[in-house]
Amino acid sequence: MPINITMPALSPTMEEGNLAKWLVKEGDKVKSGDVIAEIETDKATMEVEAVDEGTVAKIVVPAGTEGVKVNALIAVLAAEGEDVATAAKGGNGAAGAVPAPKPKETAETAPAAAPAPAAAPAPQAAAPASPAPADGEGKRIFSSPLARRLAKEAGIDLSAIAGSGPHGRVVKKDVETAVSGGAAKPAGAPAAAPAPATLAKGMSEDAVLKLFEPGSYELVPHDGMRKTIAKRLVESKQTIPHFYVSVDCELDALMALRAQLNAAAPEKDGKPVYKLSVNDMVIKALALALRDVPDANVSWTDQNMVKHKHADVGVAVSIPGGLITPIVRQAELKSLSAISNEMKDLGKRAKERKLKPEEYQGGTTAVSNMGMMGVKDFAAVVNPPHATILAVGAGEDRVVVRNKEMVIANVMTVTLSTDHRCVDGALGAELLAAFKRYIENPMGMLV
């Protein structure tokens, strides 16, 4: 029976992607773990691995196709011992499960003079591609199409099977092992998914365009990244009650320590092994502040308060067309030099769209620094599942009062945005006070 290859969900939030490149062609033999394609998501370009063995019988979605929905049929494999031509014909029946998206237009693509007539439907030789199953809590279970079919035939629950495929995906051999061992519980009806929250809509495009003279503008289609940013920020502002706390931090001691540490950096191949930035020290200070104020290192769910054991700090990085937030994991445990070198690597690969999902998804807090752009102060939008985000302004000379005398100091304004459901004003102020202590007494970050 043909094995359907469907558009994989490369992250829990992925809904669609662009099929950038096929690394196999029809007739090629593949085995589990072989890289077969490259998929562009809204944040990165990622490799897709085969999760079943077989021969590529038919490529359904051509390279360069945009907006391919998760679970849409993209190719058909002939199983071991199966006739490739027969498998290719059988795969046609599943192609109707999802409308085929249009290939990405190029300069060489000429518009069609007239729409082609619809092809007659092929005999249904294979079942339509089914959506990925979910466990009792509605969470997606990552599995191959063949594994889903075998599990259904055997009457076992995929959520009871530990996947051994790429990224924990349940594959054929996992189901066969479960069947022979009798370990999997009988499949039950999945719990009904809760109805999604209704979000308010803004002005329609027609309403907006009516306000401007024809010819005074051009329309630039939204790409996947911009759509995702818009969706998540609207959801954040409509579902998270934001609360803001600001404080001024003096930077003179931090700048002096930074210069001293950079001057003392050992060299390798004629280059210093690290070069600390102010932002590196901000990341460390926030991580230590969360360690000291653990009640602020949380995430909100409708059932529980998720208290995190480590400070995983996301750092907003501007990239063409939007931004991405790579994460420094367990930043409270890392040295300043380790944080600095890790951020340089993450930032470089972020701009190249080469980050893996686990490098930018999750985290427990975030830093958004616009100080290098001369911005004095601003407030950032909380990015769930975070409960906090720190907006960092520029350091500048200001007049401050010490011992009843006016002196000049290098001062930076920071604003903490919090999810008021789990971080109240007093708790936010406590976290910000701890951050300020580390910034103004930076030797504490070295011990």
Swiss-Prot record:
Biological processes, Gene Ontology terms: pyruvate decarboxylation to acetyl-CoA
Q: Which reaction does it catalyse?
A: N(6)-[(R)-dihydrolipoyl]-L-lysyl-[protein] + acetyl-CoA = N(6)-[(R)-S(8)-acetyldihydrolipoyl]-L-lysyl-[protein] + CoA
Cofactors needed by this protein, per the record, are:
(R)-lipoate
Q: What is its EC number?
A: 2.3.1.12
Tell me the ranges covered by the Peripheral subunit-binding (PSBD) domain, including all copies: 142-179
What's an example GO cellular component term for this entry? pyruvate dehydrogenase complex
- Which residue ranges does the record assign to the Lipoyl-binding domain? 2-78
Task: Please give the SUPFAM superfamilies that the UniProt record associates with this protein.
Answer: CoA-dependent acyltransferases, Peripheral subunit-binding domain of 2-oxo acid dehydrogenase complex, Single hybrid motif
Q: How does the cofactor bind to this protein, according to its record?
A: Binds 1 lipoyl cofactor covalently.
Region listing for Disordered, in residue ranges: 91-140
N6-lipoyllysine carried by residues: K43
A GO molecular-function descriptor: dihydrolipoyllysine-residue acetyltransferase activity
| Active site per the UniProt annotation | H420
Check the record and name the PANTHER family matching this protein: DIHYDROLIPOAMIDE ACETYL/SUCCINYL-TRANSFERASE-RELATED, DIHYDROLIPOYLLYSINE-RESIDUE ACETYLTRANSFERASE COMPONENT OF PYRUVATE DEHYDROGENASE COMPLEX, MITOCHONDRIAL-RELATED
Q: Write out the function statement from the record.
A: The pyruvate dehydrogenase complex catalyzes the overall conversion of pyruvate to acetyl-CoA and CO(2). It contains multiple copies of three enzymatic components: pyruvate dehydrogenase (E1), dihydrolipoamide acetyltransferase (E2) and lipoamide dehydrogenase (E3).
Q: What does the subunit comment say?
A: Forms a 24-polypeptide structural core with octahedral symmetry.
The molecule here is called Dihydrolipoyllysine-residue acetyltransferase component of pyruvate dehydrogenase complex
Q: What is the lineage of its organism?
A: Bacteria, Pseudomonadati, Pseudomonadota, Alphaproteobacteria, Hyphomicrobiales
